[in-house]
């Protein structure tokens, strides 16, 4: 992938448009339009973004749509798609309403409207349906947030995922806990694992168990629950307290993970830490406001935007300045997804979806989320360099703490729940 695509991540954020034009080695028309490197006459290139803009997940969905637009603006402010004569990138959004059926129909609509690629969708069930539509129509689909392993186990050729899948997050979460314990000099011999019993929670648990076995960590007790029905976690946390586990690991959504934290505050088990794994609460600013004692000391091993990356920080600042609220990691992943698509269009020099698909498969985009290297897709479409980072609530702020080379502050471990 060329230098121009890599630099786009900062374009429109740090005002690098003129530098980009010089570095790309080609003249760029700010107005867009012209003849492509393949002889196409193109003024605009349409891509589609599918997210829940209404419904219970609308807060995330709207942020993701906003970030997609910021990415498109950055590309266009840097001169558009140079290999297509400076053509403008145009974004059309689709509201999945948080349901797979609506997501499927919206994906079909966007493709019929001429979208040459899709990004989305925040929810695995919806992404599974969109992936099927993308495959049938041979239009590339880059998933920003969708953890379910099975989506990419269908032999699809047109679907790609940026984030780590659920089982990989479980594996990396266990490895991170073991490494943190070793680094701190505080042994962790036994972990209690509490997880929501759906496909996501089960996959995270299975990955965690496998990696914990390799690290010599006993996982016991293992407790599952129905995230849609649970209203109190006192019984489950009492079981954890009776087990003598050193650490409680939790893989759940926001509401149920908050219930677990409330039960920990009530039962007060003797723990070295509460350690979220791909957790939907413990790295969220809202958790600090909602949790007992502000959730002080809670960890989460999860994908997250990289606070040590200047371009990521610049995007976060631009987002808050533009929309009046802090950016969420889901939105940064959407920004990355659009940049991968834009870079592929640039590389392909074509609006042919199959040519764009081939360029996506060969991308080496440097993401703004924490990663083990440039985006690199395997034959299933999974980003093999997707990774997690450990966050911790410190002094009423979610802070990036481990591994040490990515830390914005030293971790605190042991960290008894609620202790300052």
Placement of each model-derived feature along the sequence:
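Beta-alpha junction/loop-to-helix N-cap segments that form part of ligand/metal-binding clefts
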Residues: 33-35, 59-63, 81-153, 162, ...
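Extracytoplasmic "Venus flytrap"
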Residues: 32, 38-44, 48-69, 94-101, ...
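Signal peptide-proximal N-terminal region
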Residues: 45, 67-91, 214-217
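Short, low-complexity disordered leader/linker segments with a strong preference
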Residues: 1-46, 77, 417-420
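Segments of small-molecule ligand-sensing domains
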Residues: 321, 327-328, 343-398
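Extracellular/periplasmic periplasmic-binding protein-like sensory domains
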Residues: 264-335, 404-419
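Extracellular/periplasmic Venus flytrap/periplasmic-binding protein
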Residues: 105, 150, 157-267, 306-310, ...
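Periplasmic-binding protein-like
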Residues: 49, 110-123, 142-144, 190-194, ...
């Amino acid at each position: 992938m060329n230098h121009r695509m890599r630099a786009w991540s900062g374009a429109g954020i740090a005002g690098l448009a003129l530098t980009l034009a010089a570095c790309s080695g080609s003249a760029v028309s700010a107005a867009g339009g012209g003849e492509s490197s393949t002889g196409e006459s193109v003024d605009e290139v349409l891509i589609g973004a599918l997210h829940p803009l209404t419904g219970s997940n609308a807060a995330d969905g709207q942020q993701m749509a906003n970030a997609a637009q910021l990415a498109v603006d950055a590309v266009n402010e840097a001169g558009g798609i140079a290999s297509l004569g400076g053509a403008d990138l145009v974004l059309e959004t689709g509201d999945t309403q948080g349901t797979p059926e609506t997501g499927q129909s919206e994906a079909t609509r966007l493709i019929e409207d001429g979208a040459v690629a899709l990004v989305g969708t925040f929810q695995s069930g919806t992404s599974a349906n969109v992936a099927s539509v993308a495959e049938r129509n041979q239009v590339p689909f880059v998933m920003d947030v969708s953890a379910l392993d099975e989506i990419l186990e269908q032999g699809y050729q047109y679907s790609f995922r940026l984030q780590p899948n659920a089982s990989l997050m479980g594996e990396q979460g266990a490895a991170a806990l073991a490494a943190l314990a070793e680094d701190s000099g505080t042994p962790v011999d036994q972990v209690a694992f509490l997880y929501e019993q759906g496909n996501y929670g089960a996959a995270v648990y299975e990955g965690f168990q496998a990696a914990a076995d390799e690290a010599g960590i006993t996982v016991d007790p293992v407790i599952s629950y129905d995230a849609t029905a649970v209203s109190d976690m006192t019984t489950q946390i009492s079981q954890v307290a009776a087990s003598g586990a050193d650490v409680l690991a939790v893989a759940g959504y926001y509401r149920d993970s908050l219930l677990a934290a409330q039960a920990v505050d009530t039962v007060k088990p003797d723990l070295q830490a509460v350690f979220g794994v791909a957790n939907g609460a413990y790295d969220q600013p809202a958790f600090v406001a909602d949790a007992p004692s502000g959730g002080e000391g809670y960890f989460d091993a999860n994908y997250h935007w990289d606070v040590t990356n200047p371009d990521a920080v610049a995007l976060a600042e631009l987002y808050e300045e533009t929309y009046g609220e802090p950016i969420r990691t889901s939105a940064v992943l959407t920004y990355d997804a659009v940049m991968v698509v834009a870079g592929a269009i640039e590389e392909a020099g074509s609006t042919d979806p199959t040519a764009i698909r081939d360029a996506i498969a060969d991308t080496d985009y440097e993401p703004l989320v924490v990663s083990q290297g440039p985006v690199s897709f395997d034959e299933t479409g999974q980003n093999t360099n997707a990774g997690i980072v450990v966050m911790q609530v410190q002094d009423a702020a979610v802070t990036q703490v481990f591994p040490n080379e990515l830390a914005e502050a030293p971790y605190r471990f042991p960290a008894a729940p609620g202790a300052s």
